[in-house]
Amino acid sequence: QQANDVRATYHYYRPAQNNWDLGAPAVSAYCATWDASKPLSWRSKYGWTAFCGPAGPRGQAACGKCLRVTNPATGAQITARIVDQCANGGLDLDWDTVFTKIDTNGIGYQQGHLNVNYQFVDCRD
């Protein structure tokens, strides 16, 4: 499943500062109920995102799945793990581990969002 030209905002999950703990008070990710007890290697393998895109599973069914997110303006790509849900109709990418990695020309920061393409991919866990 995939979608193009999807609005991607950013969120300050700060996973490294929160020890990659999905249930930390500063994080309180929706998927913590199911994924907070996963090993650190699993939780820290990919950057984090919230998902509410137009194509793909919702709620618990989306938790732990991976997306290949592409900034079509620059070609920059990254794999991100779904750890949360959102309500913006797209993605809410972690600032540190995902958004800044694909906002290679700084336009996303200037606009407050990126328009991205995403595709569900195998996390290879």
Swiss-Prot record:
Any GO BP: defense response to bacterium
Entry-annotated residues carrying Pyrrolidone carboxylic acid: 1
Residue span, Barwin domain: 1-125
Pfam family, one: Barwin
Disulfide partners: 31-63, 52-86, 66-123
InterPro entries listed in its UniProt record: Barwin_CS, Barwin_dom, PR4, RlpA-like_sf
Keyword tags: Disulfide bond, Lectin, Plant defense, Pyrrolidone carboxylic acid
GO molecular-function term, one example from the UniProt record: carbohydrate binding
SUPFAM superfamilies found in the cross-reference section: Barwin-like endoglucanases (SSF50685)
Domain of life: Eukaryota
Function according to Swiss-Prot or TrEMBL: May be involved in a defense mechanism. Probable plant lectin. Binds weakly a chitin analog.
Name the UniProt record assigns to this protein: Barwin
Species for this entry: Hordeum vulgare (Barley)
